[in-house]
Regions:
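Formylglycine-dependent sulfatase
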Residues: 2, 13, 17-497, 503-516, ...
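Residues forming the ATP-binding cleft of Hanks-type serine/threonine protein kinase domains
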Residues: 521
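Positively charged n-region of N-terminal signal peptides that target proteins for export
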Residues: 1-7
Length: 559
């Protein structure tokens, strides 16, 4: 066994056995239950203590934090759904595994972590959102949603029938939980398991389960202090994005107001079609629950004729109310899975990991969505519990990243980490230790432009105090020539591009090539770009060197 991995595992599991003996004793190889939500912000988990979550608590996720370790500084390497999932599966950065963007790209010749877990004797399964354009590799069992999936009565395909989707009646979060429990019920009891539970929730457009619709009606969530940000002191990327709650959230689709349909407007028609795509799947009982809340709310909104800041605040409040109503089902799911483990005497030998594919804006800077290297979307929640091996109720502030997840899985399984994986197993941190060579900085790279939200391509490096970001690339439709799959007819990337162009989505964005520098100690909200300011020469030089070192070491190929 690789000595570094052995040192990480043995103190944690209190073992003194060689690799062969460890592989023969399943007690040394815990079960792994990995729960990942889509777009679940740290701000929406009460264990992290944000003002939003105090009004909409998550008691079951908090319960997990109380019995394990909560990470305050977990980050992603590319804040976008599919690239994040590809990183999880391969342990590689986006440019290494091919998945730079949302649709095409994943290099299926790369070894997937579940394949290595299988070889180590684990029974592997995944339920819920897969969202990669390839067949699940390395899984004994899968029961996955069709692409992004729908909240109501979604389509799933299962093991042996990849691509053959069938509709199932119910709510996506509840159905995903049901299939997770089915896997646990039917697994081979003489083998350890590794189960990925990937929820669609709380992805946009935030359709709550019938029993949770409107549960936060009347709750006034506090506005983030940066909600009215005007993006001064920053470059053009913060100004040309399309993820502003006030300007870019759609009244028909995001706020579920079909009464506002304008049949003469292509954007209105598109938004209405998206809403009907969800409402049209509902059963009469589901639609009745939806109508009971939204119809009177919509009437009140239309009669109020809000505009300006009043409209922006209304949008914010109802965005957060719907989002947190969706989270209520996620929290219940976590509770059900924890209860199952305890009831079946699996809780003591199961590592439970809770995270999200990336962070999300909950009104900070006036935004929703993710993509930027700014803190709210760069951060992601991470909570890990392993009773008897990880101290209860502890917090960790070391810098970790989602490229560390794959090595951590392998270390728990006693599998040597492939050399191509550059992440670090988290076992030393989980054991309360911090290796002297633990990272002092992180690399980030976002590629997906031009597409939804128009966030510009950028990469950067972050230390515990400073962050340097480089924005680059051609603007608007000129950027398509730099985008591999958008140039290939028939690809999902090309189809998306054509749709957005037809609906007049794109701006005439400028070509960009500029840096931003932030002092996170004195400016945690990243409102003041100090790049080029007097007194920053030394730290800028240090960060520039580190950024260029990363580009060279990782063989970044977009320059």
């Amino acid at each position: 066994m690789n000595q570094n991995i052995a040192k990480a595992i043995l103190p944690l599991a209190a073992l003194s056995c060689a690799q062969g003996k460890m592989l023969a004793q399943d007690v040394a190889r815990p079960n792994i239950l990995y729960i990942m939500c889509d777009d679940h912000a740290m701000q929406a988990i009460s264990a992290y203590g944000s003002p939003i979550s105090k009004l909409a608590p998550t008691p079951n996720i908090d319960r997990l934090a109380q019995r394990g370790m909560l990470f305050r500084n977990c980050f992603v390497e590319n804040s976008l759904s599919t690239p994040s999932r590809a990183c999880l599966m391969t342990g590689l950065y986006s440019h290494q595994n091919g998945q730079r963007q949302l649709a095409e790209g994943i290099d299926t010749t790369k070894t997937f972590v579940p394949e290595l877990m299988q070889k180590a004797g684990y029974e592997t399964g995944i339920v819920g959102k897969w969202h990669m354009m390839c067949k699940p590799k390395g899984f004994d069992y899968y029961h996955i949603l069709d692409g992004q999936g729908k909240y109501y009565n979604p389509n799933f395909c299962t093991t042996g029938n990849y691509g053959k989707y069938k509709q199932e009646m119910g709510y996506a979060t509840s159905l995903t939980t049901k299939h997770a429990i089915e896997f646990l019920d039917n697994r081979q009891k003489d083998k350890p398991f590794c189960l990925y539970v990937h929820h669609k929730a709380p992805h946009r457009n935030w359709f709550a389960e019938p029993k949770h619709i409107g549960i936060y009606d009347g709750v006034d969530f506090p506005l983030p202090k940066t909600f009215w940000d005007n993006y001064e002191n920053r470059g053009s990327a913060a100004k040309t994005q399309k993820m502003n709650i006030e300007k870019d959230m759609e009244l028909i689709l995001d706020f579920k107001i079909p009464e506002l349909l304008d049949t003469s407007d292509v954007e209105s028609m598109s938004s209405y079609s998206g809403l009907m795509g969800e409402l049209g799947r509902m059963t009469p009982a589901q639609r009745m629950a939806w109508d009971k809340y939204y119809m009177p709310r919509n009437r009140r909104f239309i009669e109020a004729k809000l505009s300006g800041k009043e409209l922006a605040v209304w949008k914010y409040q109802n965005y957060i109310r719907d989002y947190m109503s969706v989270i209520a089902s996620v929290d219940e799911s976590v509770g059900q899975l924890l209860d199952y483990l305890k009831a079946h005497d699996l809780d003591k030998n199961t590592v439970v990991i809770y995270t999200s594919d990336q962070g999300f804006y909950m009104g900070e800077h006036g935004w929703f969505d993710k993509r930027f290297m700014y803190e709210e979307s760069f951060h992601t929640p991470l909570i890990i519990s392993y009773p008897g091996h990880i101290k209860e109720g502890v917090e960790n502030t070391d810098m970790v990243q989602n490229i560390d997840f794959a090595p951590t899985f392998l270390a728990f399984a006693g599998v040597e980490q492939p050399k191509e994986m550059t992440g670090k197993p988290l076992q030393p941190l989980l054991a309360g230790e911090k290796p002297k060579n633990w990272r002092k900085d992180l690399y980030y790279h976002y590629y997906d432009y031009p597409t939804y939200h128009l966030v510009r391509k950028h990469d950067g490096v972050r230390t515990d105090r400073y962050k340097l970001i480089y924005f680059y690339g051609k603007g608007g439709m000129r950027a398509v020539e730099e985008n591999k799959y958008q140039n290939i007819a028939g690809t999902s990337e090309n189809n998306c591009l054509r749709y957005l162009y037809a609906t007049n989505y794109f701006n005439e964005d400028p070509d960009v090539s500029y840096y931003e520098l932030y002092d996170l100690q004195n400016d945690p909200d990243e409102l003041n770009n100090i790049y080029g300011k007097k007194g920053t020469e030394k730290v800028t030089k240090q960060l520039m060197k580190r950024l260029n070192d990363y580009r060279k070491e990782l063989k970044i190929d977009e320059y």
